[in-house]
């Protein structure tokens, strides 16, 4: 397999690492310790430490942190609009736009 930078930068782990690094940066900008962030969000301090180290955290806990740092609108806007890469994919999206379930 040919190595390309995209193999890493477009991976789930890359996103997790970026989100964790960004959250840690916001925490430090606010002057919060992990304990303070824990007290403000109800997320255990060891969970926050693991998140900052590995990027692993529940979506609910991530949302609590995002809300505390006033990123509610940005998180709510994720996946908010349709993306497509081919005209056939766009046709499928348009055909399925009003579907309520997968069948």
Residue ranges and their predicted role:
Residues 76-103:
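Short, charged recognition helix plus adjacent turn
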Residues 21-37, 95-103:
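Short basic helix-loop element that most often maps to the first helix and adjoining turn
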Residues 23, 34, 45, 59-62:
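Helix-turn-helix DNA-binding elements, focusing on the entry/boundary residues of the two helices
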Residues 72-73:
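Short, charged/polar surface micro-motifs in flexible loops or helix N-caps
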Residues 54-68:
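Short, basic-rich loop-to-helix N-cap that marks the start of a DNA-contacting helix
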Residues 2-28:
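A short, Lys/Arg-rich alpha-helix, primarily the initiator
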Residues 26, 40, 51, 78:
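Residues in the recognition helix of alpha-helical DNA-binding motifs
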Residues 31-49:
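Short alpha-helical DNA-recognition segment
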């Amino acid at each position: 397999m040919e190595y390309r930078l995209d193999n890493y930068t477009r991976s789930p782990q890359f996103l997790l690492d970026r989100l964790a690094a960004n959250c840690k940066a916001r925490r430090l900008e606010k002057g919060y310790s992990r304990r303070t962030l824990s007290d403000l969000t109800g997320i255990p301090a060891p969970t926050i430490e693991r998140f900052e180290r590995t990027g692993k955290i529940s979506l609910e806990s991530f949302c609590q942190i995002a809300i505390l740092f006033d990123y509610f609108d940005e998180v709510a806007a994720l996946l908010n609009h349709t993306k497509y890469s081919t005209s056939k994919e766009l046709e499928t999206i348009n055909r399925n736009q009003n579907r309520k379930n997968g069948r």
